[in-house]
Amino acid sequence: MADAAEGEQPKLSKKELNKLARKAKKDEKAGEKGGNQQQAAAMDQEDASKDFYGSYGLVNSKEKKVLNFLKVKEINVSNATKDVWVRGRIHTTRSKGKNCFLVLRQGVYTVQVAMFMNEKISKQMLKFVSSISKESIVDVYATINKVDNPIESCTQKDVELLAQQVFVVSTSAPKLPLQIEDASRRAPTDEEKASEQENQLAVVNLDTRLDNRVIDLRTPTSHAIFRIQAGICNQFRNILDVRGFVEIMAPKIISAPSEGGANVFEVSYFKGSAYLAQSPQLYKQMAIAGDFEKVYTIGPVFRAEDSNTHRHMTEFVGLDLEMAFNFHYHEVMETIAEVLTQMFKGLQQNYQDEIAAVGNQYPAEPFQFCEPPLILKYPDAITLLRENGIEIGDEDDLSTPVEKFLGKLVKEKYSTDFYVLDKFPLSVRPFYTMPDAHDERYSNSYDMFMRGEEILSGAQRIHDADMLVERAKHHQVDLAKIQSYIDSFKYGCPPHAGGGIGLERVTMLFLGLHNIRLASLFPRDPKRLTP
């Protein structure tokens, strides 16, 4: 074969050509990668803020890091010019050009965070911060700056934070099931609804709130409601402790319905059945028989009532108390009324900001009460109702509408939202209620009302074993299931009385809320078992 002419390129096989093509493509990619790395390095070099923003990633306790955080509520003009760390949720974000503004929320408190592009705040940092989804939790290192004009959209109106560093602690999904601003908005009045104004802002309905309760609980109003509710429990405990009461813990799984009725949840209990307690009633009394003299308990109670109303739930928190007395059950009734009025005063003195916050979204007349509390006898209440057009029998129980109407009449006549109704008909009270000594139609029992709705039911209890058996039989209570309760009165028991208060109902009525579910963290009713 003749040699190739001088200067001519040797012919390559198809295999060799493909190999060269692959090498060229590989070299091209390597060049692109190198160029990209150089470009990224250049961008990093340009980003003067690269170490001052980003995400912590998953905080799984891999290191102990100490940062001294300042609470949002503590940010004020007295701290102006100080550099501080603050942790909170991103409530709102707005950015334009070289500026970015956040509202940082921590509980019920909010503060504005401002960022301006400069030699320390890069364009990349502004872009990153403005892209953080609402409700994400962030750490901000910033200088507290006094502002010339009040920031009306925040609780901290006289200051803002000039951010230097921003790090994401926990990211929220970008699409929220409801907006905090919408959930915080006051519901329109009837007049506003009737006007059919265009461009009305969205208002979140109750079911949507409860379906997405975790988000709804973040609103300032929800925080205020449950701070007040915690205050009710705290004051109830403190007032009774000072008066010599002992807190007890009563069982919630019991052998027989505690109220002697049918509205109970029956549960399997090994080879038999048990019930969820409708109240701690029997065990409060047994504690009195055990010479505790004055007791109280706070805990859940259960009612299997198929009532889908604004004031009923199947599970709620009971504030219950029981007390031995010397000669007359009014010793106890008046004590309970005094405890409640003392509690109302404490709430109005110590929770003014929270009461105002709730009132902004759910306007209501301030709660009124008098001292000493008004005590109205049942026959007198019946007379008052009849004088105002209500047809009702002497021994009839009060329906919910009649209770409301009576509350309205009492408010007009006595200028109080709180009163005691004494001497209920015996036929409408539980089996353990002591009959009236002078008129067998009535009983030594009482209810207490707020804004025309019952918040406490109480009475003198039967402390004689034989009489208790007689009344239990009358109410068709299975004696075998309450034998230990009956036996506790065979060995001598002081006369005693007490009552049970519904925590959520007191919260609702004190604040003038329209539905008890707003005063329950995760409410339970016949139609709701989740979340």
From Swiss-Prot:
Enzyme Commission number(s) from the entry? 6.1.1.12
> What is one GO biological process annotated to this record?
aspartyl-tRNA aminoacylation
Task: Tell me which Pfam families the record gives.
Answer: tRNA-synt_2, tRNA_anti-codon
Q: Where is the composition biased (Basic and acidic residues)?
A: 8-32
The broad enzyme category this protein falls into is ligase
**Where in this protein does the record put region Disordered?**
1-45
Any idea which positions bind ATP? R303, A304, E305, R311, H312, M313, E454, G502, L503, E504, R505
Note the InterPro entries from the entry: Aa-tRNA-synt_II, aa-tRNA-synth_II, aa-tRNA-synth_II/BPL/LPL, Asp-tRNA_synthase_2, Asp/Asn-tRNA-synth_IIb, NA-bd_OB-fold, NA-bd_OB_tRNA
A GO-annotated cellular component: aminoacyl-tRNA synthetase multienzyme complex
Q: Where does L-aspartate bind?
A: E259, R303, S457, R461
Its source organism is Caenorhabditis elegans
* Protein name per Swiss-Prot or TrEMBL: Aspartate--tRNA ligase, cytoplasmic
Subunit? Homodimer.
Query: Which segments carry the region annotation Aspartate?
Result: 281-284
Q: Which UniProt keywords apply?
A: Aminoacyl-tRNA synthetase, ATP-binding, Cytoplasm, Ligase, Nucleotide-binding, Protein biosynthesis
Which catalytic reaction applies to this protein?
tRNA(Asp) + L-aspartate + ATP = L-aspartyl-tRNA(Asp) + AMP + diphosphate
Q: Does the keyword Calcium apply?
A: no
Chief localization: cytoplasm
Q: Which CDD domains match?
A: AspRS_cyto_N, AsxRS_core
Similarity comment: Belongs to the class-II aminoacyl-tRNA synthetase family. Type 2 subfamily.
